[in-house]
Amino acid sequence: MKVNPSVKPICDKCRVIRRHGRVMVICSDPRHKQRQG
């Protein structure tokens, strides 16, 4: 899980979602998981 000021989709399977007011990227590749913070 990377914590970045700006989250961007890396590949085609990356999805940008909002959970509890946080912007997150979920993907089938676990290395692409990101959270804004």
Swiss-Prot record:
GO cellular component: cytoplasm; ribonucleoprotein complex; ribosome
GO molecular function annotation: structural constituent of ribosome
Entry-linked InterPro entries: Ribosomal_bL36, Ribosomal_bL36_sp
Pfam family, one: Ribosomal_L36
UniProt keywords, alphabetically: Ribonucleoprotein, Ribosomal protein
Alphabetized HAMAP family for the sequence: Ribosomal_bL36
Protein name: Large ribosomal subunit protein bL36
Organism name: Mycolicibacterium smegmatis (strain ATCC 700084 / mc(2)155) (Mycobacterium smegmatis)
Gene: rpmJ
